[in-house]
Amino acid sequence: MQATAEGMVQIETKMQIDNLKITIASGKGGTGKTTISTNLTSYLASKAQEVVLCDLDVEEPNSALFIKSSLKNEQICNKMVPKWESEECILCGECAKVCNFNAIVALPSEILVFPELCHSCYACSELCPTNSLPMNPQKIGEIKEYQAQNFSFIEGRLDLGQEMAVPMISQTIEYVEKNFKDCIKIFDAPPGTSCPVIEASRESDFAILITEATPFGLNDLKLAVETMRVLKQKFGVIINRYGIGDDSVEIYCKNEDIPIITKIKNDKEVAKLYSKGELIYPKIEHFKSSLDEIISFIGDING
């Protein structure tokens, strides 16, 4: 009977969280975002859930450090930038006037294009009266698909020297949406609350905000909460390394009516496993219990 009951719980959970898009974010780096992302993905896969992990911290992706996998596919990512063709240009300066990002400067004798500032909006190219600014692809990074033991792992990685993460994140999400339609999608977002985080979160069904019970943790959590509310995103909070600080985060969440999904206690053994690049839930029981609480919570709010 016990095995049957457990099976019923597992089937119910599969029905409730299948096809969900979950973003795991934080107001700052180092709170445990990637630790939760990698362990939650692997744990779901061990329960026969169809799941894919996508590392969207494209400037410094590190989920691969904790996942044993083999490369299955790779794809070059480009963004479109204008290239000045001088032959027909009348140097009217209209291109520089319409660019909101100062990516184009009109000089008396030439047009300068700064690709690192270009947002690929096509305004300069479309409004040029002599068609002297055709758009051309410029490589910005690569998407790599890996196969782990029982789940797929996608990594977006921005090339060195590239300054705009949003196009890379957008194309990585598109790759996942196209190739992994019928499964749970877990997005490991960049840290912070700027444009890359918004791009990683805005189409998700639910966001998990990772924080810690310290003054810095609370400050950055408030910024992350404000961001999610602007996006009108459903979200909950996980307090990681619970026990190292005070109760200010809990008081804040209570006052703001923010659900605390689970509290993961501070544990030296967790830190040791992390430093070795190992998954934690197979060896730390209380950590696995926290993952169960996450799965149960998401199933409840989606049910």
Over which residues does each language-model region extend?
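Walker A (P-loop) phosphate-binding motif
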Residues: 16-45
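Ferredoxin-like iron-sulfur electron-transfer modules
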Residues: 40-44, 68-91, 102-120, 150
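Short beta-strand-centered segment that lines the nucleotide-binding/catalytic pocket of NTP-utilizing
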Residues: 49-63, 137-141
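Iron-sulfur cluster-binding cysteine motifs and their immediate structural context
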Residues: 94-112, 123-139
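Flexible beta-alpha connector loops of hexameric P-loop NTPases
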Residues: 157-164
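C-terminal lobe/tail of nucleotide-utilizing enzymes
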Residues: 2-4, 9-16, 225-303
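Hydrophobic alpha-helical segments and helix pairs
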Residues: 117-151, 155
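Conserved catalytic-core segment of NTP-binding enzymes
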Residues: 130, 137-142, 167-263, 272
